[in-house]
Regions:
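Catalytic machinery of carbohydrate-active enzymes
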Residues: 1-153
C-alpha cells in the first residue's frame, strides 16, 4: 500500500470511522480555534475514539475535553529516537481518519506515518504536507475563520 495516493472525492458522512486523530501540535491560538471541531467529529462519529497529537506544552488546553478520548503528546525538541517513537505510536494506533490541520512538513510526516486509510489535510498546506492526504479541505481565505472552516468536515 502506498503512503501517497491520488486525491479522491470523499464524503466523510459515508465513512464508519472507529479511530480518528487530529494532528494540530501548535500554536496556542490555532489549537483554540480547532476546539469546535471536536463536537462536530463526535456528532458525526459518536462511537469513535478521538485522539489529538499536540505539543506537550499545550496539552493542558485540551486535557479533559468531553469529546476527546486521547492526547498524544509531542515533545517539540525530541531527539531522533523520540521522533521515531512518536511515529511508531501513531502507526500502532491504526487510525481510520487523520486530520492534518497544521499543514507543515513535520505534520505531513506524522500523517503519513499513521498509514490511515483516509488522511485529510488543508488546501493551504505548505512544505508538501498535502502529499500524504487523500482529501484537502478547501481554502476559504480570510473571509471564514479557521474554526468555521473545519466544519466542512
Amino acid at each position: 500500500m502506498s503512503l501517497f495516493r491520488r486525491k479522491l472525492p470523499i464524503d466523510l458522512r459515508s465513512i464508519d470511522a472507529r479511530r480518528i486523530c487530529i494532528i494540530k501540535p501548535s500554536a496556542f491560538g490555532d489549537v483554540v480555534q480547532t476546539l469546535p471541531l471536536l463536537p462536530v467529529l463526535r456528532e458525526r462519529f459518536p462511537n469513535a475514539t478521538i485522539s489529538w497529537a499536540i505539543n506537550r506544552g499545550l496539552a493542558d488546553l485540551i486535557d479533559g475535553h468531553p469529546q476527546l478520548d486521547q492526547i498524544i503528546p509531542i515533545d517539540r525538541g525530541a531527539s531522533l529516537n523520540g521522533w521515531r517513537q512518536l511515529l511508531s505510536q501513531l502507526r500502532r494506533e491504526k487510525f481510520d481518519i487523520v486530520f492534518d490541520l497544521q499543514g507543515l512538513l513535520r505534520t505531513a510526516v506524522m500523517t503519513a506515518a499513521t498509514r490511515a486509510p483516509l488522511r485529510v489535510g488543508l488546501e493551504t498546506a505548505r512544505e508538501g504536507s498535502h502529499l500524504p492526504c487523500h482529501m484537502l479541505l478547501p481554502d476559504t481565505g480570510k473571509q471564514v475563520p479557521a474554526h468555521l472552516r473545519y466544519w466542512k468536515v
